Swiss-Prot record:
InterPro entries: AMPD (IPR006329), Metal_Hydrolase (IPR032466)
Keyword Transport: no
Keywords, sorted A to Z: Phosphoprotein
GO cellular component: cytoplasm; cytosol; mitochondrion
Secreted found in the keyword field: no
Species: Saccharomyces cerevisiae (strain ATCC 204508 / S288c) (Baker's yeast)
Protein name: Inactive deaminase YJL070C
Modified residues (Phosphoserine): 9, 41, 178, 180
Bias kind Basic and acidic residues: ranges: 23-34
Amino acid sequence: MQAVERRPSLLFDEYQNSVTKPNETKNKEARVLSENDGDVSPSVLKQKEISVDDMDMISLPTEFDRQMVLGSPMFFDLEDEENKIDPLPSVSHHYGNGESDSFVSSYTPSNLKTGEETKDLFINPFELVSQMRKRYIAASKQDGISNIKNDTEKWFLYPKPLPKFWRFEDDKRFQDPSDSDLNDDGDSTGTGAATPHRHGYYYPSYFTDHYYYYTKSGLKGKGNIKVPYTGEYFDLEDYKKQYIYHLSNQENTQNPLSPYSSKEESLEEEFLTDVPTFQEFRDDFAYIIELIQSHKFNEVSRKRLSYLLDKFELFQYLNSKKEILANKNVPYRDFYNSRKVDRDLSLSGCISQRQLSEYIWEKINLEPERIVYQDPETSRKLSLRDIFQFGCSSNDQPIAIGLKLIDDEFLDWYRNIYLIDYHLTPNKVAKLVGKEMRFYLLAKVFLEFDNFIEGEYLAEIFIKYVIHILEKSKYQLAQVSVNFQFYSSGEDWYKKFSQWLLRWKLVSYNIRWNIQIARIFPKLFKENVVSNFQEFLDLIFNPLFTLEKEQLPIDSSVNTDIIGLQFFLSNVCSMDLVIKESDEYYWKEFTDMNCKPKFWTAQGDNPTVAHYMYYIYKSLAKVNFLRSQNLQNTITLRNYCSPLSSRTSQFGVDLYFTDQVESLVCNLLLCNGGLLQVEPLWDTATMIQYLFYLFQIPILAAPLSSVSLLNSQKSTFLKNKNVLLEHDYLKDQETAKINPSRDITVGEQRSYETNPFMKMFKMGLKISLSSKSILYNSSYTLEPLIEEYSVAASIYLLNPTDLCELSRTSVLSSGYEGWYKAHWIGVGVKKAPYFEENVGGIDNWYDTAKDTSIKHNVPMIRRRYRKETLDQEWNFVRDHFGVINSIW
C-alpha cells in the first residue's frame, strides 16, 4: 500500500514557509527518488522531523487548503473567485465600454495613457494609487533619495556626533570644577607642566572637531539656567567656518552661498512642470474618493484587515517564546537603551502642569520686581508681582496663590482662547481685564519666545525640562513642533525664531524641529493682514524663497542671521498643516473650486483642506527644489485630520465625503512625512486603512493626549466664563465675548482602551507613539515619552519585542539624518544585499549588516513576519486585481 505524504504540522512556527501545494507532492517525491536511487523513502530524507501531532493530519486538496496557501481565507464567494474578483475599476471613456457591474470610475487619473493601446485594459486600483503617490512625492522631492541629509558622505553634520559610549554623567565638561584635578592652566600633575586640555568623555583633536575646543567651566548661555547641556558649547562662528570649508570640498555641485544663476532658473521652471497641476490633483483626488466609496473594495479591505489582525495573534501564539529568546540573546540592549523619537512634541505644551507651576513660583520668589512685560499701546511696564494683581480682590495677596498657579481653568483658557486668538498673531493687542488678563500675561511671559524679555523664560524652561532631561536619558529624542506665527507688520518669523534659538543656544543632539501651519486665513483676512489666499501663502514661503536665492559671497562676511537661519532650517524635518475642529467652516459665498489663490477672497471664507494641502505642497516643492540644488536638506509634508466624522467636505462638487476623508486622501497623495493622528483613520472607510497599510505610511498615535483633549470638549472655562472673568464690554465686546458657533457637531469622547493604535500595530501599519502635548496629559514623571510607552505596555501587556518595534519605527519614520539612523538602527538608503524595508511606499531602507538587532533589539523573526506579510498582501492584490506597468 502506498504511503500517504503528510503535511507539516500547523503547530510548527515555519508552517507557512514549509507548506506544500497538493499538486506539487508527486513532483517533489519524484525528484527525491531520482537523486537517491529510490532506496530511501522520501520521508526519511526530510531534514525536519514530523511531530506526533502530525500523525492524524493528511493533506487534502480542499478549498480551504488552497486558500491557506494563498494567505487568503474564505473572503469571497465562489462566483467571484471564478471571475478573479471583478470589482476592477475601469475608466469608462478610456477603457472600451467600461462594462463592470461593481465599480466604474467617472474620473480619469491625471497623465493616464489614452488611445487604442489602452482599450479593454483593466487597471489595478492599488497599483494605480501607488503610482499616483510616487509621482506627487517625487515631484516635491520629499523622498529619501532626494534628501541629501540621508547621504552620509555629502551631508554636513553639525555638531559632530557624540561618541558611541558617551554618557551625560561621564562628560567632565558638565562636572563641578572643584571636583576636577585640573587647574586653570591645564596642570593636572602639580609639577607646572602643561598637559593637553581634554575635557569630556570624548577626546578629539582640535583639527578634527572644533566643537570640543577648550572652554572654561561654567555656563556658556545667558540667563540663570542652572542645568548643563551640550548646546551651551555651540558656536555659530565655528559652524560658519566648518560649513564653508565643507562646501569648498564639494566638487561639481552648486554652492548654497553662491549667486542663483539663470541656468538654475530654467531648471526650476522645468522642475515645476513636473508638479501636478491643481486640476490633475482634483482628478486624482476624485478617483480615490470613488474608489474608497466602492462597497466591494471596502468589503475586501475590511476582511483583509481582519485577517491581518488574526494572523498576528496566531503569529504571537506560535512565536512568542522564540521572540523572547531572541531578545535575551542580544547583549546590552533592551527597550530602555534603544533610541525612540517623539515625532510631534508641541513646544506650546512641552512641560507638565506641575513643572510650569514650580518654575513660575521660583521666579516669583527670586525676582518679583523684574520688568517682564510692556504694554504696546500705553508703554506701561509690569513686573512679575504686578501680573498677579489682575483678578485679585482687595483683600487678597497677589502672590498668595502658591503652587496652584497653573490650574485647569488656566489650561482651558490657554488652549481654547490664547492659542487660537493671540498666539498665532503676536501683534494683536489684548484688551482684557481681570483674571483673563492675568492668564494672558502668564502665557505671554512664560510660554512665548517673542516678548519683552526676548523669550528668556521659555528658553530656560525648554533647556531645563526638555533638553536636559532628553540628554541625560541619551536614548530619548524629539521632533519639537512650533507654530508658524503671522505678523501683521510683515516681520520674518523664521528670522525671529532662529535668532531666539541661537541667542539661548537651544541646540541639542536630541532635538529636531517641525513647523506647523494653522488654517487661519479668515482671521487674517478680517484683521487686514492679508487680502487673498496667495498673500497667506507668501507670508509662509517667501522668506524661504528669498533665502535660497540670495546672492552671497563664500567667505566670512556672510550675514550671521542668514547662517543662523540656515542652521535652523537644516534641523527642520517636516512642515505640518494643523486641522482643528475650531477652524472656520461655513462659507458666505461659494467660490469656484478652480479659483487661483491670488483671486480667492470670498469675503474671508476659509479654503478647504484640499486647497491648503495642495498649495502648501506646491510651494514646498519649490522650496525643496531650491534647497536640493543648494545641497541642503529637503522638508517633508504632514497633516492632522479633522476630529469630526459628520462634517461634510466643501471640496466635493459631484461627490459627497467628510472633512476626515478629505484630509486622509490629501495625506495619501501629497505627504511623505506621515499622518499625525490615528483616530480619524480608524473611523473612516476600511479601504483607506488598507491603502495606508499597503503603502506603509507612518502614523503617529498619542493616546494620552487624545484622551485628555477629547474628554474636555466642553471646557470648564467656557461653561463658567460669565462668573469667572471680568470683561471689558465698553472697549471691545467682540474680543471679550466668546462667539458662539453654529456648528452643532460634537466629537465623541474616547477612553484609552478604545484608542485604535494597538489594533493598527498588530495589523502591521507603521505606527509609533508620541507624547504630543504634555501640558494636558497629567504627566507624573520627568520622562513623558517613557510614560507613554509604559502606559501602553501596562494596558495592552506589550512584550519587549513590541516595545522595541515601536521605538525602532519611530526612528525609521523620523526626520533624523541618515548617519544617525545607520548608527541607531542600522539602515541606509544605499542599496545593500541585506534586509530591505519600505516606508511610505516610496523609500527603501536597507540594513547595513546581516543582522542589526544588536542596535534595536527587534528580532529578525518579527521583521521577517512583517515583510513577508506585506509582500503576501501585495501578491494577493496583484493576483486578484491584475498587474499593470508603470504609467508615469
